[in-house]
Amino acid sequence: MEYSHKSVLLKETIEYLNIKPEGIYVDGTLGGGGHSEEILKRLTTGKLIAIDRDLDAIKASKERLKNYKNAEYINDNFKNIKEILKSLNIDKVDGILLDLGVSSYQLEEVKRGFSYMKDAPMDMRMDKNSPFSAYDVVNKYSQQELERVIREYGEEKWASRIAKFIVKEREKGEIKTTFQLVEIIKNAVPASARREGPHPAKRTFQAIRIEVNEELKGLDKAIEDMVEVLRGKGRIAIITFHSLEDRIVKNTFKKLENPCTCPPNMPCTCGKKPVVKIITKKPVLPSKEEIETNSRSRSAKLRVAEKL
């Protein structure tokens, strides 16, 4: 399919990365290639490592960026950054970008099952080679497990009712499509709650997607690994789309900026030194204009840290 993809906070992210024409940069979430293209435009002798776990994204972006010869495409998870760079004989890089969550091209590809607005098989896998999909979560998890996932990853106040309704419904037969699930959620969420706020299925779909793709698992460790492979003055820029991700990024940056574990009123004896300086004291948010032209950007937050 043709991937139309509007990169979120594009101008701001590129500015914060402080791109050097001869530098080595990593786009850990290639997606539709929007951020990668802007990085490549600014490189002369430099190089871009473009990573995505979704092979379709790699293929589409390779085509989009075919005029640039200084890009290396890697079909892998950005969490394996150390192994990826080692395999390329690269020791340090000058900047890293992550644009977390599901991308617009994945939402647009109906059969992937990411969207609650289009009927599709229960899938939601970012890596199509993974044997584990949304179908397994919805049809095989116990009521308690479903409630935990929906509450924890969707921050859904009706998690208990939704889990109960899913289990009750699947007694009649398998839940195979997204619209089947949407209907169950609508029945579970009281009418008064459905009348206001976002689509009633939004949080549950987010929760199942995070569970299927293990999006939050090891994110803090991945950020630490990325900071480790940054050169001094190199920057890491991370765009998040919900509070769970943002909290992990914020807290990991804070820990790296102030790793001291000594009691606050005592002189430091632990020997742990700051590793980064946080560049964005508050997250950078999209402009009103960007939200109007790209609704996906509404919940985006950008945080940036610089290696000391």
From Swiss-Prot:
Matching InterPro entries: RsmH, SAM-dep_MeTrfase_MraW_recog, SAM-dependent_MTases_sf
One biological process term in Gene Ontology: rRNA base methylation
Chief location bin: cytoplasm
EC number assigned by the record: 2.1.1.199
Catalytic activity annotation: cytidine(1402) in 16S rRNA + S-adenosyl-L-methionine = N(4)-methylcytidine(1402) in 16S rRNA + S-adenosyl-L-homocysteine + H(+)
Residues reported in the UniProt entry to bind S-adenosyl-L-methionine: 33-35, 52, 78, 99, 106
Signal sequence, start to end: none
Enzyme class, spelled out: transferase
Molecular-function GO terms, alphabetical: rRNA (cytosine-N4-)-methyltransferase activity
Presence of keyword Protein biosynthesis: no
Record's keyword terms, sorted: Cytoplasm, Methyltransferase, rRNA processing, S-adenosyl-L-methionine, Transferase
Subcellular location(s) per record: Cytoplasm
A Gene Ontology term for the protein's cellular component: cytoplasm
Ranges where the record places region Disordered: 289-308
Function: Specifically methylates the N4 position of cytidine in position 1402 (C1402) of 16S rRNA.
Entry similarity comment: Belongs to the methyltransferase superfamily. RsmH family.
Annotated protein name in UniProt: Ribosomal RNA small subunit methyltransferase H
Naturally occurring in which organism (per UniProt): Thermoanaerobacter pseudethanolicus (strain ATCC 33223 / 39E)
